[in-house]
Amino acid sequence: MTDGRDDGEFAMVGEVRTGLLMNRLALPSDQVAELLDLVAGERVRARERPVPWAVSADQLHGVDCPLITRSGARPRAIGTLAARVRVVGGRVVQGSTRSVVAPGGDRRQRWSHYMARPGVVELGGRGDPADAAARFLTGRAPESLDPGAVSEALLRRIRASPLLDRRSPFRPRRTRLRWSAVVGGERLRGAFTLVDAELRTVRLRVPEAAGVTREQLTALCEDLALHDWLLTTVARVVERRASDADPAAQDDLLAVVGQLLHLWLPSADVPPGLGGMWEGIEVNPGFTRQWELCVNRLRDELTLRALRGGTVPQ
């Protein structure tokens, strides 16, 4: 999927599913690269600082299904979804699937036409991309476009890898982040919504003058999904285990400290044109404020347990 800028207004939709890599310890970088070698002849992108991550090459998935619009129309969406897997810190895994939504036409094209536009679905008839992107976050018709199903299939493939021992120190719930973005208009607007214990939605409107790419929009939503999952997971472990007298409870708390806390670095990769989205989230719902409260409670609990045991952690 090209990283280039699109001329004029364009819309994107996607879904990121985030969870813990099923392994006792963080996977070393060389094994992460092997795990993510999903497309023959394509390289795995990786970096080590400030937080190590690696991402697989894109896989394309052909689709031909309805995409319900806000007006109630059901134009067919024909084209390809681009899907990839991202591993952060050798510990957190994300299945990420997305597509540009573009106007098509009244006539169906040969598949060679759609394959020449990787990561783009075209709406038939008079389907409006921005209208379809707005409806995507709330429309749940079973036969409609479902990037999350592709993300889930990728995660199942990763879980089956012999590189993983499936001996995770704890088993947190996975989260789903569905997102839509429209590039056009004059100012940045964004909304992050907690729908339920598993599902979140992000709605973005980005000014064309920001000059953002598809890759930057995708990376922003993956970063939001990562930090939402970290906050959700740490908060749940602390809430469930802080007052638990079971010796295994301390193991869970220590596992969180040793394997997850250092991955918190919000907005580290966000381009200037999208920085306002993270600034808004820091106000409401206040990710970092909530994170600091959770971490302080976690460390206080470990200190109390150490005092009861006669030792204080250094």
Stretch-by-stretch model annotation:
Residues 181-245:
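Extended, charged amphipathic alpha-helical segments
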Residues 55-83, 206-209, 232, 295-313:
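Generic hydrophobic segment detector
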Residues 28, 56, 128, 146, ...:
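Serine/threonine-rich low-complexity intrinsically disordered regions
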Residues 223-225, 229-314:
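Membrane-associated alpha-helical segments
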Residues 1-195:
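Short Lys/Arg-enriched alpha/beta "domain-start" segment
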